[in-house]
Structures are given as structure tokens and as C-alpha cells.
């Protein structure tokens, strides 16, 4: 069904940030592995996260919803995970599927995995290759794409692994396999990626070490045989989801948007750093901590943005925010260049191609490159008037709908159903701010 976002004069209001998707996945996984019971509040109840919970239940954990965003998890502890009776369907969840591949590698179990058409087109060899070195067996073909069957090993071997591409999911899968491996597992990163796995594992009682190797390589080390213990935690607000609301405030001529309880983590701050470089009017107030993460309230109001060359050192810390950054670039004055972002080619869609198509159909001049794109900003309101093919990508859909609130003409999208994978409250939150989005 087509949905259309109509231009509005003002977006204003206060919104509590939805629970962070990355932390929500990890909470259910680590709680399911731990000894005893864990209790979580503020958990994101998007389809991706719920499928992770279902997978943990299928392998022996008890996962119970006790209220909106509140979940209790009783872990399997020392007895470990068991083979699920049916196929584990991860839907669109790359995070859940990849992290659980690492978990399954260290248990005496066999599991068949699948997903939707988008997930089954995404590369999994980048995760499978190091796990195979550790002892995982699988039935994946040469392209490493789902569906396939995994068989774990009780005698997993620790390795030192340097991922060829910066990827928090690959790092996390290897570290999670390392929990049950013989010896010390080390992941060596040339570029630091989001560190929620390391932070949350420590919260569950695991011991990790961090060191700097020659050449500025970051090493994360974990000794096998460690047991996790249950944890009570509040899930911090998702900075990637908050970015859509913050961008809406920046583009609204009378914008006055406050997003509360947003996680402030240097491995996730790239979008906000780049927005600041573009001249964004942002304010931040301390709010405390949740699950070992600093929380802030972020305020945004209208700002005349300018184009920049996005520093490549920030790419990994904003890999999910490039679609909404492209929208800001379209409204900015001057040229915005994105380079070093080839990882976008293998997200829920080919996000480089999807971003370029989204802008072009709405009258924005943009050039596609192999590792990014270059946007010629309109210096104000973009023409709009286009129908965006979302390619079943939730972040393309949300970005286009934000664009429509400040464009000259309404902007339409071909589908919004996939938004539920990461931000089920997006439509209601936008309506609270004053957006006019209709089917």
C-alpha cells in the first residue's frame, strides 16, 4: 500500500526514544545463555528482536513478556542450548541471525536457519568463515546465503581473527563463539565498530581484555569457558531510530523536537557528528545511564545545513544512518560526498542504489559511486513529488517519509510494513510531532 508524507509547517514535541535494536537483540541472547533470570525494560518490540527471542526459546530459554517493553528471560545456564525442533526463521533480522550463528557454534546442536527474501540475499560467509575456522559445520553453498543448516561443536577452537571489513556483527559472532571455545579468542579491528556486545557481556559477568596492537589495531580478547549470570537492565534509547526524528526537526522551518533517553556511545555517534559538521542546531542534556551506556536528551531545531565530505573515519559509526543523512544532504547548500561506505551495498537492500533512487525520483541531483554517493544540495526544500521504491528497506521508507514533511510536494513510498522490524512506533511518533502521513 502506498503511503504519502505531506509537507507541514511545523514539527514539534517530545518523544521517548525507542529501545535500541542492537542492545535488545543482545539482551535476549545473553539472558537466554545466562544462569538464572534476567529482567529487561524498554526492550524494542520490533519484529527483528521478537524473532531473536523466539529463536532463543526454540533452543531452550524461557522468554516472557510481562508488559509493554518489559521482558523476563530465564537462561539455560550450564546445561546449554539444545537443537530446535523446527526451522529458525529470522525474517529480516541480519543481527539476530548472525549473532546466533556465533552462539550456536559452541554448542552440541544442529539448527536450520532461514529468513525473508531480503535476508536470504545477504552475504553470510563473512560470519561463517571465522566460525568454520573454530569448528562450525554448515551446509551453506559457495555464496554463503540462507537457508542452511549449522552443526555446532563442543570442542570449538579459539582463534585470532582480523575481519577484512569493519563489522560489529562479525566481531560479535566470533566473540560469542569464543565463550565456549578452548583458549583465548581475539578479534583484531583496524577500525573500531559498535561495542554493545563487549559492554553487555561485561554486564552479564564476562571478563574481556582490550589492547592496542601495532598499527593502531584494536584487539578484543575473551577466554573460553566463562559463564554468564542474569542481569536486570533498562535498554537505552536507539540513536539510529532517534536520527529520523532529529532530522525531521532540523528540516522543519519551525522545528522544535526533543528526543529523550538516547544512547550516547562513540561507536554510534557518527550521524550526530556529521550533522554538527553540516551546521545542525543540536542540543544535548545528560540523562544518566542504562545498561552501561550513557543517556542524553537531544533537541533539534531548524538549521541551514551545508554540504561536506563525510569523514571516512565516521562511516562505521553511522552505517545505518546514511539514508537519513542523504535526506539532510538533499536540503543542504552545496555538495555532500560519501566515500568508503561500500558496506551499504549489502544491507537490507543495496542502500547506495536505494538512496540514489530515492533522491532522484524526488528531483535531487545525485551521483552514485561504488563506495558511496555525491549529492548536490538544493539549498532549501527539495522538489519532492516522487514515489519511492523502498526495496523492503525500513530505513529507506522512514527517510523518504521524513523528506516529505519538508519537501515542496508530497513524497510517497510503496510500502511501510517493514518499518515494524526496527521502529514499530515510527508512524505514531511522527504523528505526535505533527507529520501528515496518509495512505
From Swiss-Prot:
Compartment(s) of residence: Cytoplasm
Protein name: 3-phosphoshikimate 1-carboxyvinyltransferase
Pfam families to which the protein is assigned, alphabetical: EPSP_synthase (PF00275)
NCBIfam families on file: aroA
Gene3D superfamilies found in the cross-reference section: Enolpyruvate transferase domain (3.65.10.10)
Gene Ontology terms describing biological process: amino acid biosynthetic process; aromatic amino acid family biosynthetic process; chorismate biosynthetic process
Top-level taxonomic group: Bacteria
Chief subcellular location: cytoplasm
EC number: 2.5.1.19
Record keywords, A-Z: Amino-acid biosynthesis, Aromatic amino acid biosynthesis, Cytoplasm, Transferase
UniProt keyword Cytoplasm present: yes
Record function comment: Catalyzes the transfer of the enolpyruvyl moiety of phosphoenolpyruvate (PEP) to the 5-hydroxyl of shikimate-3-phosphate (S3P) to produce enolpyruvyl shikimate-3-phosphate and inorganic phosphate.
Pathway(s) it belongs to: Metabolic intermediate biosynthesis; chorismate biosynthesis; chorismate from D-erythrose 4-phosphate and phosphoenolpyruvate: step 6/7
Binding residues annotated for 3-phosphoshikimate, in chain numbering: 21-22, 26, 167, 169, 320, 347
Enzyme class: transferase
Annotated binding of phosphoenolpyruvate, by residue: 21, 94, 122, 169, 351, 395
Alphabetical list of InterPro entries matching this protein: Enolpyruvate_Tfrase_dom, Enolpyruvate_Tfrase_sf, EPSP_synthase, EPSP_synthase_CS, RNA3'P_cycl/enolpyr_Trfase_a/b
Catalytic activity: 3-phosphoshikimate + phosphoenolpyruvate = 5-O-(1-carboxyvinyl)-3-phosphoshikimate + phosphate
Family as reported in the entry's similarity comment: Belongs to the EPSP synthase family.
